[in-house]
Swiss-Prot record:
Residues 1-35 are annotated as: Disordered. It comes from Gallus gallus. It comes from the Eukaryota. GO terms for biological process: mRNA export from nucleus; mRNA splicing, via spliceosome. This is Spliceosome RNA helicase DDX39B.
Protein backbone atom coordinates (compact mmCIF):
# COMPACT_ATOMS: atom_id res chain seq x y z
CA UNK A 1 0.00 0.00 0.00
CA UNK A 2 2.65 2.51 1.05
CA UNK A 3 4.74 1.73 -2.02
CA UNK A 4 1.83 2.39 -4.38
CA UNK A 5 1.14 5.61 -2.54
CA UNK A 6 4.70 6.72 -3.06
CA UNK A 7 4.68 5.89 -6.76
CA UNK A 8 1.45 7.75 -7.39
CA UNK A 9 2.60 10.75 -5.43
CA UNK A 10 5.87 10.89 -7.33
CA UNK A 11 4.24 10.68 -10.74
CA UNK A 12 0.93 12.37 -9.94
CA UNK A 13 -0.10 11.29 -13.41
CA UNK A 14 -2.96 8.81 -13.43
CA UNK A 15 -5.14 11.50 -11.88
CA UNK A 16 -4.59 13.60 -15.02
CA UNK A 17 -6.14 10.88 -17.15
CA UNK A 18 -9.01 9.83 -14.93
CA UNK A 19 -10.24 13.14 -13.65
CA UNK A 20 -11.29 14.82 -16.87
CA UNK A 21 -10.15 18.11 -15.43
CA UNK A 22 -7.41 20.80 -15.22
CA UNK A 23 -5.67 23.93 -14.07
CA UNK A 24 -6.43 27.48 -14.92
CA UNK A 25 -4.72 30.39 -16.54
CA UNK A 26 -1.41 31.15 -14.83
CA UNK A 27 -2.41 34.82 -14.76
CA UNK A 28 -5.17 34.09 -12.26
CA UNK A 29 -2.77 32.94 -9.58
CA UNK A 30 -1.93 35.46 -6.86
CA UNK A 31 1.06 37.64 -7.78
CA UNK A 32 4.30 36.09 -6.70
CA UNK A 33 6.45 38.00 -4.29
CA UNK A 34 9.98 38.48 -5.60
CA UNK A 35 12.37 36.26 -3.73
CA UNK A 36 15.99 37.26 -3.86
CA UNK A 37 18.52 34.61 -4.67
CA UNK A 38 21.90 34.35 -6.28
CA UNK A 39 23.52 31.50 -8.10
CA UNK A 40 26.95 30.40 -7.10
CA UNK A 41 29.48 32.57 -8.94
CA UNK A 42 31.18 29.88 -10.98
CA UNK A 43 31.71 32.16 -13.94
CA UNK A 44 32.72 35.78 -13.70
CA UNK A 45 30.92 36.55 -16.95
CA UNK A 46 27.40 37.75 -16.20
CA UNK A 47 24.10 37.24 -17.98
CA UNK A 48 24.87 40.29 -20.14
CA UNK A 49 27.40 38.24 -22.07
CA UNK A 50 24.55 36.16 -23.50
CA UNK A 51 23.28 39.28 -25.33
CA UNK A 52 19.77 38.82 -23.97
CA UNK A 53 16.91 41.27 -24.56
CA UNK A 54 17.07 44.29 -22.20
CA UNK A 55 13.64 43.31 -20.79
CA UNK A 56 15.03 39.92 -19.76
CA UNK A 57 18.18 41.38 -18.23
CA UNK A 58 16.05 43.76 -16.20
CA UNK A 59 13.96 40.88 -14.83
CA UNK A 60 17.12 38.87 -14.04
CA UNK A 61 18.47 41.81 -12.02
CA UNK A 62 15.13 42.09 -10.18
CA UNK A 63 15.43 38.41 -9.21
CA UNK A 64 18.86 39.10 -7.72
CA UNK A 65 20.77 36.74 -10.04
CA UNK A 66 24.23 38.04 -10.85
CA UNK A 67 26.20 35.20 -12.40
CA UNK A 68 25.06 32.24 -14.48
CA UNK A 69 25.45 28.81 -12.91
CA UNK A 70 27.59 26.24 -14.71
CA UNK A 71 24.63 24.68 -16.50
CA UNK A 72 23.37 28.11 -17.62
CA UNK A 73 26.84 29.07 -18.84
CA UNK A 74 27.01 25.84 -20.89
CA UNK A 75 23.45 25.81 -22.26
CA UNK A 76 22.08 29.31 -22.77
CA UNK A 77 24.40 30.49 -25.61
CA UNK A 78 23.40 27.47 -27.75
CA UNK A 79 19.77 27.31 -26.60
CA UNK A 80 19.05 30.91 -27.66
CA UNK A 81 20.26 30.00 -31.16
CA UNK A 82 17.49 27.41 -31.41
CA UNK A 83 19.64 24.29 -31.01
CA UNK A 84 18.14 21.11 -29.59
CA UNK A 85 19.44 20.52 -26.05
CA UNK A 86 19.65 17.39 -23.87
CA UNK A 87 20.87 18.41 -20.43
CA UNK A 88 21.56 16.64 -17.18
CA UNK A 89 22.77 18.69 -14.24
CA UNK A 90 22.41 18.31 -10.52
CA UNK A 91 19.39 19.71 -8.73
CA UNK A 92 19.30 23.34 -7.72
CA UNK A 93 21.57 24.77 -10.39
CA UNK A 94 19.01 26.68 -12.42
CA UNK A 95 18.03 24.36 -15.28
CA UNK A 96 14.54 25.91 -15.42
CA UNK A 97 16.01 29.34 -16.12
CA UNK A 98 17.85 27.90 -19.15
CA UNK A 99 14.71 27.08 -21.10
CA UNK A 100 12.65 29.96 -19.70
CA UNK A 101 15.26 32.55 -20.76
CA UNK A 102 16.06 30.80 -24.06
CA UNK A 103 12.42 30.64 -25.15
CA UNK A 104 11.56 34.18 -24.01
CA UNK A 105 14.65 35.45 -25.87
CA UNK A 106 13.47 33.84 -29.12
CA UNK A 107 9.73 34.44 -28.68
CA UNK A 108 7.98 36.68 -31.18
CA UNK A 109 4.40 36.72 -29.85
CA UNK A 110 1.65 36.25 -32.45
CA UNK A 111 -1.92 36.82 -31.26
CA UNK A 112 -3.86 33.57 -31.01
CA UNK A 113 -0.83 31.30 -31.50
CA UNK A 114 0.87 29.04 -28.94
CA UNK A 115 4.63 29.08 -29.69
CA UNK A 116 6.11 27.41 -26.60
CA UNK A 117 5.00 24.13 -25.01
CA UNK A 118 6.58 22.99 -21.73
CA UNK A 119 5.56 19.69 -20.13
CA UNK A 120 6.45 18.12 -16.79
CA UNK A 121 5.14 15.20 -14.75
CA UNK A 122 3.42 16.90 -11.79
CA UNK A 123 0.95 19.73 -11.41
CA UNK A 124 3.00 21.51 -8.77
CA UNK A 125 6.05 21.63 -11.03
CA UNK A 126 3.91 22.90 -13.93
CA UNK A 127 2.53 25.64 -11.69
CA UNK A 128 6.03 26.60 -10.57
CA UNK A 129 7.41 26.75 -14.13
CA UNK A 130 4.52 29.00 -15.18
CA UNK A 131 5.42 31.32 -12.29
CA UNK A 132 9.05 31.42 -13.51
CA UNK A 133 7.82 32.46 -16.96
CA UNK A 134 5.74 35.21 -15.36
CA UNK A 135 8.69 36.33 -13.27
CA UNK A 136 11.13 36.56 -16.19
CA UNK A 137 8.58 38.07 -18.63
CA UNK A 138 7.75 40.83 -16.14
CA UNK A 139 8.88 43.54 -18.60
CA UNK A 140 7.39 41.83 -21.66
CA UNK A 141 3.72 42.80 -21.19
CA UNK A 142 2.53 41.32 -24.49
CA UNK A 143 3.63 37.79 -23.50
CA UNK A 144 0.82 35.57 -22.18
CA UNK A 145 1.45 32.42 -20.13
CA UNK A 146 -1.07 29.73 -19.11
CA UNK A 147 -0.79 26.51 -17.14
CA UNK A 148 -3.01 23.44 -17.66
CA UNK A 149 -3.17 20.30 -15.50
CA UNK A 150 -5.61 17.76 -14.08
CA UNK A 151 -7.69 18.48 -11.00
CA UNK A 152 -9.99 21.30 -12.13
CA UNK A 153 -12.72 21.52 -14.78
CA UNK A 154 -11.49 21.26 -18.37
CA UNK A 155 -14.05 23.90 -19.45
CA UNK A 156 -12.02 26.58 -17.69
CA UNK A 157 -8.96 25.71 -19.79
CA UNK A 158 -11.00 25.69 -22.99
CA UNK A 159 -12.29 29.19 -22.18
CA UNK A 160 -8.76 30.50 -21.59
CA UNK A 161 -7.58 29.09 -24.93
CA UNK A 162 -10.60 30.52 -26.75
CA UNK A 163 -10.78 34.00 -25.20
CA UNK A 164 -7.20 34.77 -24.17
CA UNK A 165 -4.92 32.41 -26.10
CA UNK A 166 -1.46 32.22 -24.46
CA UNK A 167 1.87 32.28 -26.32
CA UNK A 168 3.42 29.94 -23.74
CA UNK A 169 1.67 26.83 -22.41
CA UNK A 170 2.96 24.82 -19.44
CA UNK A 171 1.25 21.62 -18.35
CA UNK A 172 1.10 17.90 -17.66
CA UNK A 173 0.85 15.49 -20.64
CA UNK A 174 -2.60 14.10 -19.71
CA UNK A 175 -4.31 17.50 -19.78
CA UNK A 176 -2.33 18.87 -22.73
CA UNK A 177 -3.30 15.81 -24.80
CA UNK A 178 -6.99 16.13 -23.82
CA UNK A 179 -7.02 19.79 -24.91
CA UNK A 180 -5.19 19.02 -28.16
CA UNK A 181 -7.50 16.10 -29.01
CA UNK A 182 -10.65 18.18 -28.56
CA UNK A 183 -9.10 20.90 -30.75
CA UNK A 184 -9.10 23.53 -27.98
CA UNK A 185 -5.29 23.67 -28.04
CA UNK A 186 -3.74 24.20 -31.47
CA UNK A 187 -0.15 22.90 -31.59
CA UNK A 188 0.50 23.69 -35.27
CA UNK A 189 2.54 26.81 -34.46
CA UNK A 190 4.80 25.34 -31.75
CA UNK A 191 8.41 26.49 -32.19
CA UNK A 192 9.81 25.26 -28.85
CA UNK A 193 8.99 21.86 -27.26
CA UNK A 194 10.40 21.35 -23.74
CA UNK A 195 10.30 18.43 -21.28
CA UNK A 196 11.40 19.16 -17.71
CA UNK A 197 12.33 16.15 -15.53
CA UNK A 198 12.14 14.31 -18.87
CA UNK A 199 13.23 10.94 -17.50
CA UNK A 200 10.10 10.73 -15.33
CA UNK A 201 7.86 11.24 -18.37
CA UNK A 202 9.70 8.97 -20.78
CA UNK A 203 10.35 6.06 -18.40
CA UNK A 204 6.61 5.55 -17.78
CA UNK A 205 5.15 3.95 -20.90
CA UNK A 206 1.66 5.48 -20.59
CA UNK A 207 3.10 8.96 -20.17
CA UNK A 208 5.65 8.39 -22.95
CA UNK A 209 2.81 7.47 -25.34
CA UNK A 210 1.01 10.71 -24.48
CA UNK A 211 4.19 12.75 -25.01
CA UNK A 212 4.76 11.06 -28.38
CA UNK A 213 1.20 11.75 -29.53
CA UNK A 214 1.51 15.41 -28.51
CA UNK A 215 4.92 15.62 -30.22
CA UNK A 216 3.42 14.34 -33.50
CA UNK A 217 0.83 17.16 -33.41
CA UNK A 218 3.59 19.81 -33.48
CA UNK A 219 5.51 21.00 -36.59
CA UNK A 220 8.53 19.00 -37.75
CA UNK A 221 10.75 22.09 -37.58
CA UNK A 222 11.03 23.19 -33.96
CA UNK A 223 13.50 23.40 -31.10
CA UNK A 224 13.39 20.49 -28.62
CA UNK A 225 14.95 20.78 -25.16
CA UNK A 226 14.97 18.18 -22.38
CA UNK A 227 16.27 18.54 -18.83
CA UNK A 228 16.66 16.39 -15.73
CA UNK A 229 18.86 15.91 -12.68
CA UNK A 230 18.97 12.16 -13.30
CA UNK A 231 19.34 10.85 -16.84
CA UNK A 232 20.26 7.17 -17.03
CA UNK A 233 22.24 5.82 -19.98
CA UNK A 234 19.15 3.74 -20.89
CA UNK A 235 16.83 6.74 -21.23
CA UNK A 236 19.21 8.97 -23.23
CA UNK A 237 18.58 7.19 -26.59
CA UNK A 238 14.83 7.58 -26.00
CA UNK A 239 15.32 11.34 -25.53
CA UNK A 240 17.45 11.60 -28.68
CA UNK A 241 14.63 10.16 -30.83
CA UNK A 242 12.74 13.43 -30.32
CA UNK A 243 15.72 15.55 -31.39
CA UNK A 244 17.84 16.51 -34.38
CA UNK A 245 21.57 16.52 -33.65
CA UNK A 246 21.16 17.81 -30.07
CA UNK A 247 23.82 19.50 -28.02
CA UNK A 248 24.30 17.14 -25.06
CA UNK A 249 25.38 18.60 -21.76
CA UNK A 250 26.04 16.37 -18.78
CA UNK A 251 27.37 18.85 -16.25
CA UNK A 252 28.05 16.05 -13.79
CA UNK A 253 28.86 12.44 -14.38
CA UNK A 254 26.01 10.20 -13.20
CA UNK A 255 28.01 8.88 -10.28
CA UNK A 256 29.04 12.32 -9.09
CA UNK A 257 25.68 13.95 -8.46
CA UNK A 258 26.83 15.40 -5.18
CA UNK A 259 25.56 18.74 -4.00
CA UNK A 260 28.26 21.15 -2.99
CA UNK A 261 27.57 22.89 0.29
CA UNK A 262 25.12 20.20 1.44
CA UNK A 263 26.04 18.39 4.67
CA UNK A 264 24.55 14.86 4.75
CA UNK A 265 24.07 12.74 7.90
CA UNK A 266 22.04 9.78 9.13
CA UNK A 267 20.48 8.90 12.50
CA UNK A 268 19.99 5.23 13.51
CA UNK A 269 16.82 4.76 15.56
CA UNK A 270 13.60 2.74 15.90
CA UNK A 271 10.48 3.82 14.04
CA UNK A 272 8.72 4.77 17.29
CA UNK A 273 11.65 7.04 18.26
CA UNK A 274 11.43 9.23 15.15
CA UNK A 275 9.03 11.87 16.51
CA UNK A 276 11.00 12.58 19.67
CA UNK A 277 14.28 12.81 17.71
CA UNK A 278 12.73 15.09 15.11
CA UNK A 279 11.36 17.48 17.76
CA UNK A 280 14.74 17.55 19.52
CA UNK A 281 16.57 18.37 16.28
CA UNK A 282 14.08 21.08 15.30
CA UNK A 283 14.67 22.63 18.73
CA UNK A 284 18.46 22.76 18.44
CA UNK A 285 19.09 23.33 14.73
CA UNK A 286 19.05 26.78 13.13
CA UNK A 287 16.83 26.86 10.08
CA UNK A 288 15.22 29.23 7.59
CA UNK A 289 12.78 26.63 6.28
CA UNK A 290 12.61 22.83 6.58
CA UNK A 291 11.11 20.08 4.40
CA UNK A 292 10.32 16.73 6.08
CA UNK A 293 9.70 13.78 3.72
CA UNK A 294 7.46 10.85 4.69
CA UNK A 295 6.35 7.77 2.75
CA UNK A 296 2.54 8.00 2.81
CA UNK A 297 -0.36 10.43 2.90
CA UNK A 298 -1.48 9.12 6.31
CA UNK A 299 1.94 9.69 7.89
CA UNK A 300 2.12 13.14 6.28
CA UNK A 301 -1.19 14.23 7.84
CA UNK A 302 -0.40 12.73 11.26
CA UNK A 303 3.12 14.19 11.51
CA UNK A 304 2.05 17.69 10.43
CA UNK A 305 -0.72 17.63 13.05
CA UNK A 306 1.72 16.46 15.72
CA UNK A 307 4.18 19.24 14.85
CA UNK A 308 1.47 21.90 15.13
CA UNK A 309 0.43 20.47 18.52
CA UNK A 310 4.08 20.84 19.61
CA UNK A 311 3.98 24.51 18.48
CA UNK A 312 6.09 24.04 15.35
CA UNK A 313 4.80 26.17 12.41
CA UNK A 314 4.12 23.21 10.08
CA UNK A 315 2.03 22.71 6.95
CA UNK A 316 1.42 19.51 4.92
CA UNK A 317 1.26 18.86 1.17
CA UNK A 318 0.07 15.53 -0.25
CA UNK A 319 -2.02 14.22 -3.14
CA UNK A 320 -5.01 13.46 -0.90
CA UNK A 321 -6.01 17.13 -0.75
CA UNK A 322 -7.86 19.13 -3.44
CA UNK A 323 -5.71 20.73 -6.12
CA UNK A 324 -6.46 24.35 -5.09
CA UNK A 325 -5.51 23.51 -1.50
CA UNK A 326 -2.19 21.98 -2.59
CA UNK A 327 -1.21 25.01 -4.65
CA UNK A 328 -2.36 27.39 -1.93
CA UNK A 329 -0.21 25.60 0.66
CA UNK A 330 2.77 25.47 -1.70
CA UNK A 331 2.47 29.24 -2.18
CA UNK A 332 2.14 29.84 1.59
CA UNK A 333 5.35 27.91 2.22
CA UNK A 334 7.14 29.65 -0.65
CA UNK A 335 6.02 33.03 0.72
CA UNK A 336 7.54 32.12 4.11
CA UNK A 337 4.17 32.08 5.93
CA UNK A 338 5.10 28.64 7.30
CA UNK A 339 8.62 27.46 8.03
CA UNK A 340 8.14 23.67 8.16
CA UNK A 341 6.67 21.58 5.34
CA UNK A 342 5.75 17.90 5.71
CA UNK A 343 5.49 16.26 2.29
CA UNK A 344 5.39 13.04 0.33
CA UNK A 345 7.53 12.43 -2.76
CA UNK A 346 5.08 14.62 -4.63
CA UNK A 347 7.25 17.53 -3.50
CA UNK A 348 10.52 15.71 -4.15
CA UNK A 349 11.42 16.68 -7.70
CA UNK A 350 12.21 20.08 -9.08
CA UNK A 351 10.37 22.21 -6.53
CA UNK A 352 12.23 25.42 -5.78
CA UNK A 353 11.98 27.03 -2.37
CA UNK A 354 15.06 29.17 -2.03
CA UNK A 355 15.01 29.53 1.76
CA UNK A 356 14.99 25.79 2.57
CA UNK A 357 18.25 24.85 4.27
CA UNK A 358 17.32 21.56 5.99
CA UNK A 359 15.72 18.43 4.50
CA UNK A 360 14.72 15.46 6.68
CA UNK A 361 14.12 11.95 5.36
CA UNK A 362 11.76 11.01 8.21
CA UNK A 363 11.08 7.88 6.13
CA UNK A 364 13.84 6.52 3.91
CA UNK A 365 13.22 7.10 0.17
CA UNK A 366 12.70 3.97 -1.93
CA UNK A 367 15.82 4.43 -4.09
CA UNK A 368 18.93 6.55 -4.64
CA UNK A 369 17.32 8.76 -7.33
CA UNK A 370 14.52 9.74 -4.96
CA UNK A 371 17.10 10.41 -2.23
CA UNK A 372 18.91 12.85 -4.53
CA UNK A 373 15.76 14.73 -5.50
CA UNK A 374 14.59 14.95 -1.89
CA UNK A 375 17.82 16.20 -0.29
CA UNK A 376 18.33 18.65 -3.15
CA UNK A 377 15.46 20.71 -1.71
CA UNK A 378 18.07 21.99 0.78
CA UNK A 379 21.07 23.99 -0.36
CA UNK A 380 19.69 24.98 -3.77
CA UNK A 381 21.42 27.54 -5.98
CA UNK A 382 24.78 26.60 -4.54
CA UNK A 383 23.96 27.71 -1.00
CA UNK A 384 24.61 25.69 2.16
CA UNK A 385 22.23 23.09 3.52
CA UNK A 386 21.76 20.06 5.74
CA UNK A 387 20.16 16.68 4.97
CA UNK A 388 19.34 14.26 7.80
CA UNK A 389 18.07 10.73 7.10
CA UNK A 390 16.41 8.48 9.68
CA UNK A 391 17.50 4.84 9.36
CA UNK A 392 15.23 2.41 11.24
CA UNK A 393 15.71 -1.04 9.67
CA UNK A 394 17.95 -3.16 7.43
CA UNK A 395 16.21 -2.06 4.24
CA UNK A 396 16.82 1.61 5.15
CA UNK A 397 20.50 0.82 5.75
CA UNK A 398 20.74 -0.93 2.37
CA UNK A 399 19.29 2.08 0.52
CA UNK A 400 21.66 4.42 2.36
CA UNK A 401 24.58 2.23 1.25
CA UNK A 402 23.28 2.33 -2.34
CA UNK A 403 23.21 6.13 -2.17
CA UNK A 404 26.79 6.28 -0.90
CA UNK A 405 28.04 3.84 -3.54
CA UNK A 406 26.25 5.44 -6.45
CA UNK A 407 27.07 9.05 -5.66
CA UNK A 408 30.51 8.34 -4.18
CA UNK A 409 29.60 10.28 -1.06
CA UNK A 410 30.29 9.47 2.58
CA UNK A 411 27.22 9.98 4.78
CA UNK A 412 28.28 9.81 8.42
CA UNK A 413 26.32 9.51 11.66
CA UNK A 414 24.90 12.78 12.94
CA UNK A 415 27.33 14.24 15.51
CA UNK A 416 26.16 15.68 18.83
CA UNK A 417 27.00 19.18 17.65
CA UNK A 418 27.11 20.69 14.18
CA UNK A 419 28.80 23.97 13.31
CA UNK A 420 25.95 26.31 12.30
CA UNK A 421 28.08 27.97 9.62
CA UNK A 422 28.38 24.63 7.79
CA UNK A 423 24.68 24.48 6.88
CA UNK A 424 23.28 28.02 7.00
CA UNK A 425 24.37 31.17 5.20
CA UNK A 426 25.41 33.76 7.75
CA UNK A 427 24.52 36.75 5.58
CA UNK A 428 21.09 35.88 4.26
Amino acid sequence: MAENDVDNELLDYEEDEVENAAGGDGSEAPPKKDVKGSYVSIHSSGFRDFLLKPELLRAIVDCGFEHPSEVQHECIPQAILGMDVLCQAKSGMGKTAVFVLATLQQLEPVTGQVSVLVMCHTRELAFQISKEYERFSKYMPSVKVAVFFGGLAVKKDEEVLKKNCPHIVVGTPGRILALARNKSLNLKHIKHFILDECDKMLEQLDMRRDVQEIFRMTPHEKQVMMFSATLSKEIRPVCRKFMQDPMEIFVDDETKLTLHGLQQYYVKLKDNEKNRKLFDLLDVLEFNQVVIFVKSVQRCIALAQLLVEQNFPAIAIHRGMPQEERLSRYQQFKDFQRRILVATNLFGRGMDIERVNIAFNYDMPEDSDTYLHRVARAGRFGTKGLAITFVSDENDAKILNDVQDRFEVNISELPDEIDISSYIEQTR
